[in-house]
């Protein structure tokens, strides 16, 4: 009898958990809505190939629609903010600092659709995002001398990164690095300087070979990779036309051993032999479909990312993602977790 009661109670618990996941009357600040939004943000950060991780800022809208059979479609409109963690950084996004307005913040608006199977708990995620930096006018309105964001391919930014890299390679005996990606550059004032964020990777060359245009240098194979996240400031004038030679600079690079199977180890291969300049803002940066084969509803474990390399399929998003017009929902948009850019 006790076993039967326990079985009934277990069924009620499972049923309650399942029904909470597929509620159709969600408001944007409901816990269930936050769980769906966290799912979408997690996938964005796990599969974003360039730049920095994103943090949830506002759930702008949510709509849960019954689909075919056991499928439920969850449509989300999200506003995210750029953090200071690069996408290759293993730090959980919850522990990443959101880039503040005085440091020229960048926001990202995303349309997401999660197809959820209530029987198998499988999720198919479709995401389309567009990032936009805060306007220069807004930054200067509150802080006239705050650093201004520059395109990562700005000549001063590129030259300054190469200058710092050469200085590092001179000091690191037996270890030579090359730029994997320039993810941020800013023009600073008083004193005038260039602030840089970039990622470097160790290569299988000597210093002499690295300067030989005829010698092919490559990053080490998976499991032997050493990458470093660098934040540097090079003090030089915007009017300088020559490449930096003896300018003062400050730099801090955190070196990370990349383990084979690390959640983002496959992304390093995406960077190798590619353009080392991060894509500029104001463009759609994500357009992917990724199936999730979880067999439970847990939001904690995502080891499958490390076990199986993700295959990206270039395809048009279903029209019902960006063209799905969700009617305004009571309680939406939700609260602002950080700040709004205007």
Curated annotation (Swiss-Prot):
GO MF terms, alphabetically ordered: cysteine-type endopeptidase inhibitor activity
PTMs per UniProt: Cys-63 may exist in a mixed disulfide form with a thiol compound such as glutathione.
Note from the entry: Is highly stable to extreme pH and heating, stability that may be conferred by the disulfide bond between Cys-28 and Cys-332.
Indispensable for metalloproteinase inhibition as annotated region, ranges: 24-108
Record organism: Protobothrops flavoviridis (Habu)
Family designation: Belongs to the fetuin family.
Tissue: Expressed by the liver.
Domain Cystatin fetuin-A-type as annotated: residue spans: 22-130, 141-254
UniProt protein name: Antihemorrhagic factor HSF
Keyword Secreted: yes
């Amino acid at each position: 009898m006790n076993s039967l009661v326990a079985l009934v109670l277990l069924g009620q618990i499972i049923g309650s958990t399942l029904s909470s996941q597929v509620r159709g009357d969600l408001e944007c600040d409901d816990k269930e809505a936050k769980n769906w939004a966290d799912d979408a943000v997690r996938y964005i950060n796990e599969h974003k190939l360039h730049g920095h991780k994103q943090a949830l800022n506002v759930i702008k809208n949510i709509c849960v629609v019954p689909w075919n059979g056991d499928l439920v479609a969850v449509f989300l409109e999200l506003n995210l903010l750029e953090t200071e963690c690069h996408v290759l950084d293993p730090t959980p996004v919850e522990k990443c600092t959101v880039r503040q307005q005085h440091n020229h913040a960048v926001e990202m608006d995303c349309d997401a659709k999660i197809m959820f199977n209530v029987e198998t708990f499988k999720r198919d995620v479709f995401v389309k995002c567009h990032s936009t930096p805060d306007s220069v006018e807004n930054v200067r309105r509150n802080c006239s001398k705050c650093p201004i964001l520059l395109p990562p391919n700005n000549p001063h930014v590129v030259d300054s990164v190469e200058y710092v890299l050469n200085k590092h390679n001179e000091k690191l005996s037996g270890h030579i690095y090359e730029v994997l990606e320039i993810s941020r550059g800013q023009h600073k004032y008083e004193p005038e300087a260039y602030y840089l964020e970039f990622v470097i990777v160790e290569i299988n060359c000597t210093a002499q070979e690295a300067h030989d245009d005829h010698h092919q240098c490559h990053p080490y194979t998976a499991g032997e990779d050493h990458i470093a996240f660098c934040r540097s400031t090079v003090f030089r004038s915007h009017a300088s036309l020559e490449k930096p030679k003896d300018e003062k600079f400050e730099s801090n690079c955190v070196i990370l051993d990349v383990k084979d199977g690390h959640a983002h180890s496959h992304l390093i291969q995406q960077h190798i032999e590619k353009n080392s300049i991060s894509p500029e803002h104001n463009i759609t940066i994500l357009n992917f479909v990724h199936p999730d084969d979880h067999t439970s509803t847990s939001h904690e474990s995502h080891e499958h990312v490390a076990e199986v390399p993700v295959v990206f399929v270039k395809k048009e998003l279903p029209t019902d993602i960006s063209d799905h017009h969700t009617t305004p929902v009571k309680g939406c948009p939700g609260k602002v977790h950080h700040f709004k850019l205007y």
